[in-house]
């Protein structure tokens, strides 16, 4: 069957009609036969079981009954009007109730005619009924068909209102598969199908819509999920191979004076085994003559920054400049100040460039950067401006890169004739499956060990009506010489109200902790950069005991004496944000605490987030739970979500299939990196199609 048939517009499907066709196109993005065939059910109903009314369960669930309508009556007036039919199975009776389409139903339903009804039991005022049941005229030949699993397709409110029911969609797919009998070209080679005992493509498509049995359904879903994840991994791994083969990088083969002096004379502690392992991986990349593209992951406080600095020293020892780009000015300043202390000991020239840098200083930086006098530049997105020119940029480090767009990162990479080595750092732990998908084209290093002596933070949840006891705890901590963060949410959609909450909180704390005994700093987005920096400095120098802030302190702030993090309206933060904020304390020798404040009314999702925070300090466990709650698109944001748009596979529930698909993709490309072997011809055709069209499911051979 040729591919033109699969490209046939759905308008030509028997019984669809122009009006419904337009609605389906608009609501479901189904435009042609292949789109409809690849519109997979979201779940299945088992309609093989029939109940007698006397044996119905005593709880709300789906049931199916065979019987006759013995009586029909209208009850109530206006909005309370409803149609009630009494359904008799030969022994007992149950009420069927409809609140909509009453006139049409009254004409359509026939007394003393045998029907099969299907619906959810409802219990109200000691009476059991079935609201809005599905009805079908009883035909003995239909019993065999109904014994199979029934597909339930994704829908929308508009579709339901316009009469495009699940039954309509299901019937359209039936016409497509059993009357028109469309066929798909196979995408997976025979040797893989045989080796992995996979169903062929067409059997999988047919059985995912209308499974013969549970076993075939499982095999069909497994086949289609594996296919989707295999081609995702082939794309990502081939991209990685291409970079290593074709994109040559600077060869940093010297470990010289800067690195050795720092390691032997300046570094005052032993690196963890995890840090040593990661440093070795980076050094291997830098000496491979290919461009490094590595993601460095590590939980809060795991020691990523020191690894970044040591990587910079290798670049400097080989005669190249480096840059570090961070998403916020506060984080840029923190990196600069931390690096400056170490750089001075090594006589390294380091500068800071942000939006608030004075014009005269900017001009001097531009000049010395282009001449090669500057060794390291740290900054925000200011680094990607056209005015910023390097003499020989050899290494670019990007911190919290998910907060930058692709275009911003590309501009940074373009500042060198030979692509600089790229090290991406994140303190936002990324679940393994998400890392394999969103960052599957990068090499990944993981610091999965905290330095010795790092103490766990005690996290508790307190309701707003416990505020006085929380104030008492803050006072005790301050009297012991500690400092306290109090963080408020600031969300764009409600920023005016959030700003008011922040200022109300400041006034409340000012009344409770009066001057001159207590000093309070406040930092928020409406302040000028220099004012923020001034208040942060006061807190860092222990001139103030309490810092009230919005999430501008989410990453990068390092105050070892701060031992308490109070997060107001904690139910409004995501898990990742809560974990990052908690990571601002516990950086010194003192026992530290995180207190999650909230109102008394919490959604189930909020309760789950708060419970997770109180039960673990492990950022990777938290990331897995966050993925489970929010899904991959929300976690990565719109800039990243495109790479993980999946039609049938799921990054949360299909981890085993994803890991296996990546393993298979690696083996295939190890043996045949360009997919030129004749046995991989199907893979190559499909891969080329995806590369061009960005969509596996539009491939029809």
Language model region names:
Residues 68, 120-121, 235, 570, ...:
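Short, surface-exposed secondary-structure boundary micro-motifs
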Residues 22-23, 249-296:
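Conserved pre-motif I regulatory segment
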Residues 280, 291-611, 621:
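Inter-lobe coupling/hinge segments of SF2-like helicase ATPases
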Residues 39-66, 70:
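OB-fold nucleic-acid-binding modules
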Residues 537-547, 553-560, 565-568, 583, ...:
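Accessory helical-bundle/CTD segments and flexible terminal tails appended to RecA-like ATPase motors
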Residues 75-266:
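Upstream accessory/linker segments immediately N-terminal to the RecA-like ATPase cores of bacterial MutS
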Residues 132, 140, 395, 411-413, ...:
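N-terminal cationic and glycine-rich segments that engage phosphates or anionic surfaces
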């Amino acid at each position: 069957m040729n591919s033109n048939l699969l490209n046939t517009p759905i308008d030509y499907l028997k019984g669809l009609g122009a009006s419904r066709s337009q609605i389906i196109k608009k609501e479901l993005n189904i435009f042609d036969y292949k789109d409809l065939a690849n519109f997979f059910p979201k779940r299945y109903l088992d309609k093989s079981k029939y109940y007698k009314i006397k044996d119905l369960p005593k709880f709300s669930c789906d049931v199916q009954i065979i019987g006759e309508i013995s009586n029909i009556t209208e009850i109530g007036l206006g909005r309370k009007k409803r149609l009630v039919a009494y359904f008799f199975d030969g022994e007992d009776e149950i009420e069927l109730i409809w609140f909509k389409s009453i006139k049409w139903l009254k004409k359509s339903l026939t007394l003393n005619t045998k029907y099969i009804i299907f619906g959810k039991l409802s219990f109200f005022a000691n009476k059991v009924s079935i609201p809005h049941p599905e009805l079908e005229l009883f035909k003995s030949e239909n019993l065999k068909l109904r014994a199979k699993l029934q597909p339930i397709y994704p829908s929308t409110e508009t579709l339901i209102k316009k009469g495009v029911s699940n039954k309509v969609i299901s019937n359209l797919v039936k016409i497509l598969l059993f009357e028109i009998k469309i066929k798909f070209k196979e995408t997976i080679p025979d040797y893989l199908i045989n080796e992995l005992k996979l169903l062929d493509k067409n059997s999988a498509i047919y059985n995912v819509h209308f499974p013969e049995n549970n076993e075939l359904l499982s095999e069909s879903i497994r086949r289609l999920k594996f296919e989707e994840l295999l081609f995702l991994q082939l794309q990502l791994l081939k991209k990685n191979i291409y970079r290593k083969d074709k994109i040559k990088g600077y060869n940093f083969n010297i470990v010289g004076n800067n690195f050795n002096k720092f390691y032997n004379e300046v570094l005052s502690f032993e690196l963890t085994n995890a840090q040593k392992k990661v440093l070795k991986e980076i050094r291997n990349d830098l000496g491979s003559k290919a461009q490094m593209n590595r993601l460095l992951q590590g939980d809060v406080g795991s020691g990523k920054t020191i690894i970044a600095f040591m990587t910079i020293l290798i670049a400097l020892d080989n005669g190249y400049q480096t840059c570090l780009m961070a998403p916020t000015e506060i984080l840029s300043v923190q990196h600069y100040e931390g690096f400056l202390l170490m750089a001075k000991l090594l006589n390294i020239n380091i500068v800071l460039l942000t939006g608030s840098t004075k014009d005269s200083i900017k001009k001097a930086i531009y000049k010395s950067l282009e001449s090669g006098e500057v060794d390291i530049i740290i900054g925000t997105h200011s680094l990607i401006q056209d005015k910023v020119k390097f003499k020989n940029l050899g290494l670019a480090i990007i911190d919290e890169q998910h907060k930058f767009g692709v275009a911003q990162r590309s501009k940074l990479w373009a500042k060198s004739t030979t692509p600089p080595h790229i090290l991406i750092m994140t303190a936002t732990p990324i679940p393994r499956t998400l890392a394999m998908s969103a960052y599957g084209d990068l090499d990944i290093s993981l610091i999965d060990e905290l330095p010795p002596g790092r103490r766990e933070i005690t996290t508790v949840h307190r309701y707003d009506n416990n505020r006085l006891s929380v104030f008492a705890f803050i006072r005790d901590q301050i009297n012991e010489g500690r400092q306290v963060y109090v963080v408020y949410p600031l969300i764009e959609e409600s920023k005016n109200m959030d700003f008011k909450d922040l200022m109300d909180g400041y006034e409340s704390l000012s009344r409770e902790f009066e001057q001159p005994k207590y000093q309070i700093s406040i930092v928020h987005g409406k302040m000028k950069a220099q004012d923020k920096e001034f208040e942060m400095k006061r807190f860092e120098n222990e001139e103030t005991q309490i810092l009230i802030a919005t999430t501008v302190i989410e990453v990068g702030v390092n105050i070892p004496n701060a031992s308490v993090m109070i997060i107001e309206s904690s139910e409004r933060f995501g898990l990742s944000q809560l974990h990052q904020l908690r990571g601002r304390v516990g950086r010194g020798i003192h026992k530290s605490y995180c207190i999650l404040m909230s109102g008394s009314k919490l959604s189930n999702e909020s309760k789950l987030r708060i419970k997770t925070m109180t039960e673990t300090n492990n950022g990777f466990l938290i990331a897995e739970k966050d993925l489970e709650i929010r899904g991959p698109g929300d976690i990565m944001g719109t800039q990243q979500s495109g790479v993980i748009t999946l039609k049938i596979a799921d990054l949360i529930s299909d981890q085993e299939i994803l890991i296996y698909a990546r393993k298979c993709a690696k083996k295939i490309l190890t043996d045949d990196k360009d997919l030129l072997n004749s046995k991989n011809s199907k893979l190559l055709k499909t891969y080329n199609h995806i590369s061009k069209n960005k969509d596996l499911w539009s491939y029809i051979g």
